[in-house]
């Protein structure tokens, strides 16, 4: 399992919270103190919280469950997409569409439409259309790519959400809560931890800090799914050996 350490988090500025006047009192137990009217997050709590979350993610990924990466603000968007793709997990990095979880039936129709347009763009259908029609379909496809491209292979509701900036992604968290889907979230000093099952106290604006969180989750997903695959191969080999040995035993 991937690990995070305090030194890397310090270097990345993960301990810097928001201005003290913007704090959320529900985060008080994670705050070490204040410096120049900026709250300082206690990284001695961040590290074990992160590792606990990674343990949970590992248990999901070992069973080939899906973790939906969510981070739509500018600082998180690129990292979320890159790391989710690297680890073979679904993601939302542009804008959360209301009902993405709670109205998944409708979202599935949009995914079908997106796949259809994708196929048309590759099989020469677009070339047979007028320039105007082709442009309209290309624009529709691009719009769908931004909104649901990251979940087109999810194949159903995710088994957990991993969220950067829980206040910014509150709609996603509420939908997950409604459906009983566990939420892992990076929570800053100005944010509300309610509705987050695995709270990771940390700066949710610094790009280097975001990279650490997201990379650790992606690495854990990759390692877990690879070890699960290796375990399956070993099981098959043992079964074959046993089958081959059976006649000799008679």
From Swiss-Prot:
Matching Gene3D superfamilies: Glucose-6-phosphate isomerase like protein, domain 1, Helix hairpin bin
Entry GO CC: cytosolic small ribosomal subunit
Matching SUPFAM superfamilies: Ribosomal protein S2
PROSITE patterns, A to Z: RIBOSOMAL_S2_1, RIBOSOMAL_S2_2
InterPro entries recorded: Ribosomal_uS2, Ribosomal_uS2_bac/mit/plastid, Ribosomal_uS2_CS, Ribosomal_uS2_flav_dom_sf
GO molecular function annotations of the record: structural constituent of ribosome
Keywords for this protein: Ribonucleoprotein, Ribosomal protein
Family as reported in the entry's similarity comment: Belongs to the universal ribosomal protein uS2 family.
Protein name as it appears in the record: Small ribosomal subunit protein uS2
Source organism of the structure: Marinobacter nauticus (strain ATCC 700491 / DSM 11845 / VT8)
